[in-house]
């Protein structure tokens, strides 16, 4: 990874990195060198602060609170760093009492952006996830089979519901910040939901 950072620095190539690992802090000196020449930013994905939900769905990943500490440290160092609440999983980590503390913690860590991504189930992952549900959360299996019956993405209505939950969970002042204004004079984190495009029928000719 060091060689990649060095190449980005040497060519002054703007960069942004998305990761779930606080080990990104090891590369902070090189990121700061890049920031002296061009734009450099980061984003850490954090699905939840609910330890039970985290251990059930991401048992071998870094502790979410360690990721938040990395967000805070990167921002203190001058690297704009946001938080991506991902994946958002209906019935697993999307309850208000799960989302709101994470939003508050992200803001406290100085997150420059806060977004969310609904769970995607592509390829073989879909079967594996459904099997996991049947073993660990059989109460949710029928719901997920219905939500993902047409493909890898949840229906638009479900994605909009999750987007609204992220927005509602933000503190009052942030609810009134439009995305355009937030990007212009940066009064606080940008609250948004990163979404997948609706499927479009492709043409052969």
Predicted feature residues:
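Conserved AdoMet/S-adenosylmethionine-binding subsite of the radical SAM
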Residues: 1-143, 147, 151, 155
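C-terminal accessory extensions appended to soluble enzyme cores
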Residues: 132-145, 149-205
């Amino acid at each position: 990874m060091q060689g990649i950072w060095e190449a980005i620095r040497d060519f002054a190539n703007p960069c942004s990195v998305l990761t779930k690992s606080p080990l990104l802090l090891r590369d902070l000196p090189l990121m700061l060198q890049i920031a002296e020449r061009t734009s450099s930013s980061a984003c850490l994905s954090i699905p939840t602060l609910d330890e039970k939900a985290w251990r059930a769905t991401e048992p071998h990943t870094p502790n979410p609170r360690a990721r938040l500490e990395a967000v805070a440290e990167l921002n203190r160092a001058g690297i704009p760093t946001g938080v991506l609440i991902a994946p958002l999983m209906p019935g697993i980590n999307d309850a208000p009492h799960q989302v709101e503390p994470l939003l508050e913690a992200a803001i406290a860590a100085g997150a420059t952006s806060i977004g969310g991504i609904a769970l995607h189930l592509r390829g073989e992952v879909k079967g594996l996830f459904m099997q996991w549900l049947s073993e660990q959360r059989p109460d949710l299996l029928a719901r997920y089979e219905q939500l993902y019956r047409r493909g890898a993405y949840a229906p638009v209505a479900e994605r909009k519901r999750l987007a609204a939950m992220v927005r509602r969970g933000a503190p009052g002042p942030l609810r009134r910040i439009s995305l355009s204004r937030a990007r212009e004079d940066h009064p606080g984190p940008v609250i948004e939901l990163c979404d997948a495009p609706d499927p479009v029928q492709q043409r052969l000719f």
